[in-house]
Structures are given as C-alpha cells and as structure tokens.
Amino acid sequence: MTRREILLGGASITLASCAPSTRIGRATPPKPFTLTDFTLVRDGLDAPEGIASSPDGRLFISNGGGAIGVLERDGTLRQIGKALAPNGVAVDREGRVIVANMGLLNKGPGPLQRIDVATGTVETLVSELEGRQLVASNGPATARNGDIYCTHSSWGPIGNIGTTTPAGFIYRVAPDGRASIVARALRGVNGLCLDREERFVYASLTAEGRIRRWRRQADGSLIDPQDYGPQLGVVIADHQAKDIRAMPVADRAELGYCDGIAFDAAGNLWVTLPFANRIVAITPDGRKVDIVHDPEDRMLSSPTNLCWGGADLRDLYVVSRASGVVVKARTDIAGLPLANWPAA
C-alpha cells in the first residue's frame, strides 16, 4: 500500500464520523476557480501571512518588512513600524489595523498590536495574559461594537502542526482595553472570523482540520462550542511541518490543516488549506466545496489567508506565503463586509 493510499484510507474513516453540524438555510455555493482566474497583485514580499482590505482600496499585508505593510492604490508598498513576527491581520471599525504576532517563529514575544496607518503609531494591546507572556498570537477578528478577538495557537513548539496538546485559546480585548481568555483547550487554533450578525465567532483548528464556532454573548464572552461543517481533510497526530514538506505533492493535496477563514455574503465560509495548496468553502448547509487547487505552486504556494476588497467586494485577495506574493480573482458572490466596511 502506498503512502497516498494510507492517507486516503484514513481520511475515509475520519470524515465518515463528521456529519455537518449546522443547517441554516438554503445554500448558494460559490463557483470554483481555475488557476487562470488569478492575477498577480504584489510579489517580492518577505514571508507574507495576513491580509485585510479597506473601502478606499488599500490592502494591509503582514510581512517581514514592518509591523504592517500598506499596499496603496497606486501599487506602492509602505511599511509601518518594526516587524516582530507579524501574522494575522484585521481592521477595526475606526480603520486601525490589528496585527497578531506569532513570536514562536523567531523565538520572541507574540503580542497583539494596533496600528494607526495615518500617523504610523504602533501600540501594544495585549502582551501577556494570566501572568504569562504571549508567544503565539495568530488570527485577529473585529466586531462592530469594538470587541477584538484573537487566537493564541500554542506555547510551542512551532513545528508541531498536528499537535495533540490542547494548549491554544481565544482571547478578547474589550472596547475599554481589558483582555481576557474566552475559549480554552484548543488544538492549534488559527484563523478567526465572525458571521454577518456577529452572533458567532468561528475559528480554524489547524491540528484537527476543522472549524469550530462559539455563540457570542452580550458581554463578549463565548459559549456553546460546536464543530461547524465536515472535517476538511486528512490530519495526523503530532504531524511535524518538516515531515509534511517532505511529502509528495499528491499526498499533501489531501491534508486538511486549515488556516485563514472568511465568510462571503451568501454565508459560505471560505477556508485556506496551505499545506494542500487548496481553498475550500463550507456552505450554509454544511457541505465542503472545492474552490481551487494548485498542485504545482503556479499561483497558490501555501495560501495562508484571504479577504475580499474592491468597490463591490468581489475581488478576492489571497496571500501565497511560500512564494511571497498576493494574488487576486473575481468571485461570483461578494465578500461579507467586515467591521471597517459599511454594513450591507
């Protein structure tokens, strides 16, 4: 039996036990892409990871050149501040950029920062919680009432993609600046987003290859965790990044290690699978839909995060970390307007 047959066999066993957890109405699934649908937006980026958009046409891209990179409408990339370990990116209702720092990447701190792109001011929102310095802030998300949520993936080591240690958590920064942990005991928690009504917070659990959501309370706390949709592919206990990268490309295509997530306006949750070079979506009725796969690294080489932009929110931007580029495609369904955009 080949390695691929073993992986696929494991997938069939695992996926059969994961029925869709949510049925919330008739689904309008997104149309799949071909690689020719993508065009290059920016290349030459140093380890880009997160991305967010502004109604004025600018993009905010985390990369090694600064605390945040601002891609202006004329194509100029303006770096602000000093890079720590910039990772996930969001924008608050006032247009300030929220950057999570994955300190484990360079054995440094992993705080959550807020950046005023007009003045260049960089401030630290959270550097420690419950007496412990943060080292793995990963994916932030903002709500229209001023709440900020962020994932903290683990305490290390960084290379254990399939970690079986549930040491990750989600923390919240209230509008008054107070920070607290609102969800615990998560395996490799990563990307984060809210739905249209901001009733639920959704997170990708990389090590489990699935999405989980929590009901959001009036005080910002999170309750009632539920797995959302099917498992997204093969996952292996304590799977190491170096071993994943050594796998044949065809075998990596089946991996379900999920990263960035974002909703479109029809309620489809788009998910990047960086090790598989794949983007999928979970429909409102709980089905997984394949959007695009790039087995040869032509346009998508470790796609980590995505966002919508453009005047009609139909420009989908995807960060391709391994190749240091951002690419764009037009979608048939617009993206969900986030906290810094006018509500639809």
Give residue spans per PLM region.
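N-terminal export signals
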Residues: 5-22
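A short beta-strand motif characteristic of beta-propeller blades
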Residues: 37-42, 76-81, 123-129, 178-183, ...
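A short loop-to-beta-strand structural motif that recurs across blades of beta-propeller domains
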Residues: 67-69, 111-113, 169-171, 210-212, ...
